[in-house]
From Swiss-Prot:
<dbReference type="InterPro" id="IPR050078">
    <property type="entry name" value="Ribosomal_L11_MeTrfase_PrmA"/>
</dbReference>
<feature type="binding site">
    <location>
        <position position="185"/>
    </location>
    <ligand>
        <name>S-adenosyl-L-methionine</name>
    </ligand>
</feature>
<protein>
    <recommendedName>
        <fullName>Ribosomal protein L11 methyltransferase</fullName>
        <ecNumber>2.1.1.-</ecNumber>
    </recommendedName>
</protein>
<feature type="binding site">
    <location>
        <position position="249"/>
    </location>
    <ligand>
        <name>S-adenosyl-L-methionine</name>
    </ligand>
</feature>
<feature type="binding site">
    <location>
        <position position="163"/>
    </location>
    <ligand>
        <name>S-adenosyl-L-methionine</name>
    </ligand>
</feature>
<keyword id="KW-0963">Cytoplasm</keyword>
<feature type="binding site">
    <location>
        <position position="207"/>
    </location>
    <ligand>
        <name>S-adenosyl-L-methionine</name>
    </ligand>
</feature>
<dbReference type="InterPro" id="IPR029063">
    <property type="entry name" value="SAM-dependent_MTases_sf"/>
</dbReference>
<dbReference type="GO" id="GO:0005737">
    <property type="term" value="C:cytoplasm"/>
</dbReference>
<dbReference type="InterPro" id="IPR004498">
    <property type="entry name" value="Ribosomal_PrmA_MeTrfase"/>
</dbReference>
<comment type="similarity">
    <text>Belongs to the methyltransferase superfamily. PrmA family.</text>
</comment>
<keyword id="KW-0949">S-adenosyl-L-methionine</keyword>
<dbReference type="Pfam" id="PF06325">
    <property type="entry name" value="PrmA"/>
</dbReference>
<keyword id="KW-0808">Transferase</keyword>
<comment type="function">
    <text>Methylates ribosomal protein L11.</text>
</comment>
<dbReference type="GO" id="GO:0032259">
    <property type="term" value="P:methylation"/>
</dbReference>
<dbReference type="GO" id="GO:0016279">
    <property type="term" value="F:protein-lysine N-methyltransferase activity"/>
</dbReference>
């Protein structure tokens, strides 16, 4: 079996929007982003080495976005749809980079192993390290927990700044036990797994895609974690109960949809952790939080990305 690859020379600013569009609207089999600065700058995490630099000499100055489709998919139609989407994003004032689109085909079995060379251990903190399942790694600290991950085609390994900002927020928030967490838009389940490793006792992972449900269940099993439940739903729709922590690493536009739902699902004294926010979109998030009775306790930044620790306003 072959895969059709659509490659777009673009920018970090739109990679998440393209990922969601490809998976949800075009039924892509998987997506991938390669960004040189993400790999080169990852050393800010305690000078840890994420990848060998020889492995990424072919990465772009900014971002290559790849979407993978069945070889029978209509290549020209997909290219046209991506072109239209790029112009739509440009109309929002976002940087779309060169927006050059190219296509190619690859044997499915070649892809299954070739892409793994780009991903290695992320020694995130004294509490957590992210370890792709094909890597051997011993904890760097006595109490360091390992998150074993099989990212597959559709979801990342935790090297993106937005994931790291969300994990920072979780490390700060999970200080008492027992504690319950809902991970909204879980993707590979990495934040839900991190919450479990940090001591959360009851965890719900939600997403709109079947692929995410499967990936989260498989990654939970890989880590021998049994306290993560998965639910296919849009944001917190159809979710029962309240939680001590709500964590969401998703696009700002989707966070704006989530904010009005949070009060009904957050325990008294609970915290919310947001990531995935481009700094240009922060004012809209701040305004919506204020209008819905929330305040920002902590702002975390990496490059153009912003993470937030949020609680209810005092009444």
């Amino acid at each position: 079996m072959k895969l059709l690859i659509i490659k777009i020379d673009t920018s970090q600013e739109v990679e998440d929007a393209l990922s969601i569009y490809a998976m949800d609207n075009l039924n892509a089999l998987g997506v991938e982003s390669r960004n040189r600065s993400d790999f080169e700058q990852a050393g800010w995490l305690h000078d840890s080495t994420v990848v060998d630099m020889d492995d990424i000499k072919d990465l772009p100055k900014d971002t290559y976005f790849y979407a993978y489709f069945d070889e029978e998919a209509d290549r020209d139609e997909l290219v046209k749809k991506f072109q239209d989407k790029m112009q739509e994003l440009k109309g929002y004032g976002l940087n779309i980079g060169d927006a050059k689109i190219t296509t190619s085909y690859i044997e499915d079995q070649d892809w299954n192993t070739a892409w793994q060379k780009y991903y290695h251990v992320i020694n995130f903190s004294r509490h957590l390290a992210i370890v792709p399942k094909w890597e051997d790694y011993k904890p760097a600290f006595k109490d360091q927990q390992l998150i074993k991950l099989d990212p597959g085609l559709a979801f990342g390994t935790g090297n993106h700044k937005t994931t790291q900002l969300a994990m920072m927020g979780l490390e700060r928030a999970i200080v008492k036990k027992p504690i319950s967490v809902v991970d909204v838009g879980t993707g590979s389940g990495i934040l839900a797994i991190a919450a479990s490793k940090l001591g959360a006792t009851d965890i719900l992972a939600t997403d709109i895609s079947d692929e995410s449900m499967t990936a989260t269940e498989q990654n939970s099993a890989l880590n021998d974690i049994k306290n993560i439940r998965v639910q296919k739903t849009s944001l917190l729709a159809d979710v029962d109960g309240k939680f001590d922590i709500i964590v969401a690493n998703i696009l700002a536009e989707i966070l704006l949809e989530l904010i009005p739902q949070m009060d009904a699902h957050l325990n008294e004294g609970g915290q919310v952790i947001f990531s995935g926010i481009d700094y240009l979109q922060l004012p809209k998030i701040e305004k919506s939080l204020d209008e819905n009775g929330f305040k920002i306790d902590l702002t975390m930044k990496q490059g153009r990305w912003v993470g937030l620790a949020i609680t209810r306003k005092e009444k």
